[in-house]
Amino acid sequence: MPQQNYLDELTPGFTPLLAIKEASRCLLCHDAPCSQACPAQTDPGKFIRSIYFRNFKGAAETIRENNALGAVCARVCPTEKLCQRGCTRSGIDKPIDIARLQRFITDFEQQTAMQIYQPGSKTRGKVAIIGAGPAGLQASVTLTHLGYDVTIYEKQPQPGGWLRHGIPAFRLPQSVLDQEIARIVEMGVNIKCNCEVGGSLSLAQLKAEYRAVLMTVGMSCGSGLPLFEQASHVEIAVDFLQRARQADGDISVPRSALIIGGGDVAMDVASTLKILGCPSVTCVAREELAEFPASEKEFTSTQALGVSIIDGFTPVAVSGNKVTFHHVRHSGELTLEAENIILAVGQHARLDTFAEIKAQHNIIDTHNYQTDDPAIFAAGDIVKGDKTVVYAVKTGKEAAQAIHHYLEEACSC
């Protein structure tokens, strides 16, 4: 098996012939379950039908009508839990590979320089968005389509949020994200980077300048465990992934690594370590396989790289480079030793700089995405719901519609 490069995509894309062949397996359901199961309403049933009839531009238009990050979602969305899970073809052999078909179309869109999005009219006034992650980017597109002049404030040097700083390049190449964002900027969305709201620029200042403000700050801070507070050779998963991404994978790796956690972030850490040359990588999760939080796609690809995954154990003691685990249901005990220990046990947002907003456990309580302040809305990871990219797209789109409804009502008073 050839060595996987950090910058090369792990999963190959479809050629036109393979895409048409895969689309031809579709049963062309009248009321397609796959379309009903997509949180972003990307409508796989419709774009697969277009591919089947060789109408690639029509397929791209269907995707972009509902999902400004179609190329991103095609690569990182847990489709086996969503649209592919609803595929009727599963009852015959296996579901349609919806993710790769969507990736083929969005790649074709870029390769042929399709112009699907048009600049917005900017006739309805100004709206500010805090955070240029998936929720903020999608909201900016929806608001621009509705006629608003949108400015996104992003604290990092480049937009993208977790898409840029956390997801490994072999899952999401930077060029793909750059192309998605360039398309959004061409619509007329203004993105101001290196501009953190909550410091010299306050939420109150934005409220004074804009008709509405949407908060889409992500959960970019990694969580730790009290057990490991005094331990050496311990790193938070978010920090490790950011280091690897910023260096294009050019970082040193240990001879052995122990990852604690069982979600997609843990799988990304484990896969990154193996791809960068770490000989021994073990991942231990407290969840048992039947309830594993990682997507099947991530879990399978991580195992294929040679990562050892142990389920059902939780850490109870640490001594130097050794960690002792107890089984969550049985009396079993396990002790593992590794040069480095990486904690992938959750993430949280930094909301303490937004004193005006009430938040509990890093979640902002909203009613239809509206906070206690009627002119301030929230979407993405900081509202209740799933923490995947496709759900961020969903909340960004719905929050934009809620803002539009609020401003329309304000004008009619």
From Swiss-Prot:
One of its GO terms (molecular function) is dihydropyrimidine dehydrogenase (NAD+) activity. InterPro entries: DPD_II, FAD/NAD-bd_sf, FAD/NAD-binding_dom, Helical_ferredxn. Its EC number is 1.3.1.1. It is an enzyme of class 1 (oxidoreductase). It catalyses: 5,6-dihydrouracil + NAD(+) = uracil + NADH + H(+); 5,6-dihydrothymine + NAD(+) = thymine + NADH + H(+). GO terms for biological process: pyrimidine nucleobase catabolic process. The keyword NAD applies. It comes from the Bacteria. The keyword Oxidoreductase applies. Keywords: NAD, Oxidoreductase. Belongs to the NADH dehydrogenase family. Involved in pyrimidine base degradation. Catalyzes physiologically the reduction of uracil to 5,6-dihydrouracil (DHU) by using NADH as a specific cosubstrate. It also catalyzes the reverse reaction and the reduction of thymine to 5,6-dihydrothymine (DHT). This is NAD-dependent dihydropyrimidine dehydrogenase subunit PreT. The gene is preT.
